[in-house]
């Protein structure tokens, strides 16, 4: 089992944790419908970058 040789100082502990910060996911607004969606994903209505790429079940 791994055991530390020396105690890690609060500064080094903070540096170790500096990469653990959470980031907010990128959210985009669809220009045609005004709905929000994740970047590089289609909106719930099936639109992507102003074009309808997926038909709704009601339209099919």
Curated annotation (Swiss-Prot):
Disulfide bonds: none annotated. Keywords: Ribonucleoprotein, Ribosomal protein. It comes from Paracidovorax citrulli (strain AAC00-1). Signal peptide: none annotated. Residues 1-60 are annotated as: Disordered. HAMAP family: Ribosomal_bL32. One of its GO terms (molecular function) is structural constituent of ribosome. One of its GO terms (biological process) is translation. It holds the Pfam family Ribosomal_L32p. Residues 9-19 have a biased composition (Basic residues). This is Large ribosomal subunit protein bL32. Belongs to the bacterial ribosomal protein bL32 family. One of its GO terms (cellular component) is large ribosomal subunit. InterPro entries: Ribosomal_bL32, Ribosomal_bL32_bact, Ribosomal_zn-bd.
């Amino acid at each position: 089992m791994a055991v530390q040789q020396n105690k890690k100082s609060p500064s080094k502990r903070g540096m170790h944790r500096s990469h653990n910060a959470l980031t907010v996911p990128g959210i985009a607004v669809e220009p045609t419908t005004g709905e929000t969606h994740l970047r590089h994903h289609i909106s719930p209505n099936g639109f992507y970058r102003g074009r309808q790429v997926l038909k709704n079940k009601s339209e099919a």
